[in-house]
């Protein structure tokens, strides 16, 4: 399948106000993909590409993370291309690996097992109007448009903590996070609602599930450095892995203690060397 050569990259405050990690990540997509159009989005130019599907009063209630989730599915549904989170670092040109994994017209790194439909959302690639991403966009928008939620605060936290005891026990029970009783009675949703709804979209439609299963799985390795701690000392083992470029993309974080950022740490090697 043909993925349009567009890379979508969002930082609301603009590039000049972005932290070092975000600036370096943006530069990495430009450096390794000179034949791709890298589109930097911020709050000033976002409406040049999409009109938010949610009413303003609903959209303003959502966290920036959820707004970003809505933006990515709207952009990919309308234009296709690659969504790269602002803290995702490109290490291998997209032309060198992505096409092999886009038989479904969509690609995402897989979380543990493909059968459950769980994906990572920080890197997504789709063709324009891909049926899976279109259905996801419609479903995700409707979830927030057609329901009234406690978006934060003590009530929401208590209810979510209670529901987690039952709904997070197994993969299969997570589908009930978007059920009528949770939406209309408890009026809350968990942090990973995007991922749970995506899995529901896949598993509730035979044709979409069939299409999804044609996507060659690539089990996520991009956040493997996180388990070591990005500010920990760079060992020979980690350096060898980074230098091998076996991982095409890394998921980083811009939230770290500046005093711990030094030439001996993993993050410094990724960004500066």
Residue ranges of predicted features:
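Glycosyltransferase-associated regions of secretory-pathway enzymes
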Residues: 1-68, 84-273
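Small-residue hinge/turn detector
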Residues: 69-81
């Amino acid at each position: 399948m043909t993925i349009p050569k567009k890379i979508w990259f969002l930082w609301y405050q603009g590039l000049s106000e972005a932290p070092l990690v975000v600036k370096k990540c943006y530069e990495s997509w430009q450096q390794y993909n000179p034949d791709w159009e890298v589109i930097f989005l911020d709050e000033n130019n976002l409406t040049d590409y999409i009109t938010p599907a949610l009413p303003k009063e609903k959209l303003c209630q959502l966290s920036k993370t959820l707004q970003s989730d809505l933006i990515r599915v709207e952009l990919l549904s309308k234009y296709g291309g690659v969504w790269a989170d602002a803290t995702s670092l490109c290490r291998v040109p997209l032309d060198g690996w992505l096409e092999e994994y886009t038989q479904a017209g969509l690609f995402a790194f897989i979380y543990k097992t493909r059968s459950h439909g769980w994906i990572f959302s920080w890197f997504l690639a789709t063709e324009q109007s891909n049926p899976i991403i279109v259905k996801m966009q419609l479903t995700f928008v409707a979830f927030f448009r057609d329901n009234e939620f406690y978006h934060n605060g003590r009530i929401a936290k208590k209810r979510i903590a209670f529901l987690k005891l039952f709904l997070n026990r197994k993969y299969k029970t997570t589908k009930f996070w978007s059920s009528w009783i949770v939406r209309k009675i408890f009026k809350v949703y968990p942090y990973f609602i995007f991922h749970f709804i995506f899995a529901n979209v896949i598993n509730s439609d035979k044709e979409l599930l069939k299409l999804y299963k044609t996507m060659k799985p690539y089990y996520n390795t991009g956040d493997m450095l996180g388990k070591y701690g990005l500010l920990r000392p760079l060992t020979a083992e980690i350096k060898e892995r980074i230098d091998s470029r076996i991982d095409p993309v890394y998921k980083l974080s811009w939230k770290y203690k500046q005093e711990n950022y030094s030439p001996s740490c993993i993050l410094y090697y990724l960004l500066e060397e």
